[in-house]
Design a protein with these regions (language model features):
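Rossmann-fold dinucleotide-binding core
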Residues: 24-94, 98, 102
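NAD(P)-dependent Rossmann-like dehydrogenase/reductase catalytic/cofactor-binding core
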Residues: 87-93, 118, 123-227
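N-terminal alpha-helical segment
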Residues: 8, 57-58, 108-109, 140
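C-terminal regulatory/interaction module of P-loop NTP-utilizing enzymes
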Residues: 83, 109, 114-122
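Rossmann-like NAD(P)-binding element
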Residues: 1-24
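Short, small-residue-enriched loops and turns at beta-alpha junctions
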Residues: 2-5, 98-99, 148
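Structural/interface elements that position substrates and couple domains in central-metabolism enzymes
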Residues: 101, 105-106, 111
């Protein structure tokens, strides 16, 4: 079904009537709120979003988004199911429009449109800025772990202390949140958990080895793409 609340609500209501009570009902919506989609569905505790990435047969990630009435029992069941078919479920803690990846992509997309509109770069130059820069790192680690490495031995704590003030600089059309102690603590704790006890040096070495191999692979396929 298309990304339309009215249509999806009607469809899920019908599915809810005929599905077994303990069957998970999941929509692959790209950004609609599950609570609204399943507002008329029977047994809403088993409803959720399962948002995959294209091409689905190549990308293992899937965002699992609960509604306000979704139970942990069914979220755990969905988590196990996706893992059983070699998917990597990303368990979103609570519903929000656009979920996670599309919100991040949308921010990058909008910023790119501003840059193009104001004549700073072409679409090709912008794409190359990602392809030959952060995009290479992002395929191995996300923004937060990357910035954790940027902080040197002290990791994210030092990174926030040194580069946190840059949030106030006019580098983006997007308004930055206030870098409060609470936000800083959450970011530092999160990246520390991601590091799994490994030092910044260890993670940097793994990243560098990966990037060497990735560049070899990219050269092989880039020639085909750019002919």
């Amino acid at each position: 079904a298309t990304e339309n609340y009215s249509l999806k609500t009607k469809l899920m209501n019908i599915i809810g009537k005929y599905a077994k009570k303990n069957a998970i009902i999941s929509s692959s919506s790209s950004g609609l709120l599950p609570t609204r989609i399943y507002s008329k569905c029977k047994n809403p505790e088993r409803t959720m979003i399962g948002h995959p990435f294209n091409p689905v047969y190549m990308c293992p990630g899937v965002e699992v988004v609960p509604g306000k009435k979704t139970s942990k029992k069914y979220l755990n069941k969905a988590n196990k199911f996706y893992k059983s078919i070699s998917m990597n479920p990303i368990m979103v803690q609570k519903e929000l429009p656009g979920y996670l990846s599309d919100r991040l992509q949308e921010a990058l997309w909008r910023e790119g449109l501003h840059i193009i509109n104001e004549g700073y770069a072409t679409t090709e130059e912008l794409d190359r800025a990602i392809e030959d820069g952060p995009g290479m790192r992002w395929s191995l680690m996300g923004t937060f772990l990357t910035f954790h490495l940027a902080g040197g031995k002290a990791g994210m704590k030092h990174m926030l202390e040194q580069f946190g003030p840059a949030l106030k600089l006019p580098w983006t059309k997007l308004k930055a949140p206030k870098l409060s102690k609470k936000l800083s603590s959450r970011v530092i704790a999160g990246t520390k958990k991601q590091a799994k006890g490994k030092s910044v040096t260890m993670i940097s070495n793994i990243r560098d080895q990966y990037l060497v191999e990735l560049q070899k692979l990219r050269k092989k396929y880039e020639n085909k793409l750019r002919k």
